[in-house]
A protein has these predicted regions:
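N-terminal accessory beta-strand-rich subdomains and adjacent acidic, glycine-rich linkers
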Residues: 1-168
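An acidic-aromatic substrate-binding cleft motif
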Residues: 133-218
């Protein structure tokens, strides 16, 4: 595989600037099979789809269920993206990113007719996709290739391209189970609000005197 990034060295007339767009493209010669998920600024919790690249736009509108937390990007897919070149010598290709620091996360816009993808950066409310002070670098754009899908998991590329931890002691980190309320919230079944009161003062309002709305996920 390979990884590449863009560097912005400090220069006399290049100290601060705003990223408007990144035009990195991943072009493929054939209509490969793709395992993909719709791109969303706010959520990564959708079902994976299995289609050819050319079929992504036709499937896109049917590839998600509406929920209460949704900022979709039309005809774009999430990163990482898995592809397969069929034929006598099959090839699996994974597109991802690493070391996303002080820079927007990346999605992939689909050009289905030409079998290619272009980076689509997550914007803020003003439409800016990065406030950069030089010297600076972008995240790594990565392509991992293998004739066997399971061998992609053995690649250490993403591990090596991310910065090592700055924590000196990680012995306290242990595997555990977590039970949260997110799934109930994104389908509109539950909410954070404890009551229907519309004027709550944190540290002042006596919640014991409020009437529960019955929709809080902990109820």
């Amino acid at each position: 595989g390979l990884g590449f990034r863009y560097e912005f060295p400090q220069q006399k007339n290049l100290n601060y600037f705003i990223i408007k767009e990144e035009d990195t493209e991943f072009d493929f010669p054939t209509d490969m099979k793709a395992w993909w998920m719709v791109a969303d600024y706010d959520s990564q919790e959708y079902r994976y789809q299995e289609t050819n690249i050319s079929e992504i736009p036709a499937r896109w509108d049917k590839a998600f269920d509406s929920n209460a937390s949704q900022k979709l990007i039309k005809n774009a897919v999430q990163s990482p993206l898995m592809l397969k070149k069929n034929g006598k010598e099959p090839l699996y290709i994974n597109i991802a990113e690493a070391a996303v620091l002080n820079y927007a996360a990346s999605h992939l816009e689909v050009d289905a007719q030409n079998f290619k993808f272009k980076t689509h950066l997550t914007a803020d409310r003003q439409g800016a996709k990065g406030y950069i002070q030089t010297p600076s670098v972008t995240p790594w754009r990565t392509i991992i290739v293998s004739p066997k899908a399971e061998d992609l998991m053995d690649s250490k590329m993403l591990f090596n391209l991310n910065e090592p931890t700055k924590y000196t002691d990680t012995s306290y980190i242990k595997p555990t189970k977590y039970m949260g309320v997110w799934w109930e919230m994104i389908i509109g079944k539950a909410q954070w609000a404890y009551s229907t009161a519309d004027n709550v003062h944190l540290g002042i309002t006596d919640f014991s005197k409020l009437t529960p709305n019955g929709k809080h996920a902990a109820n």
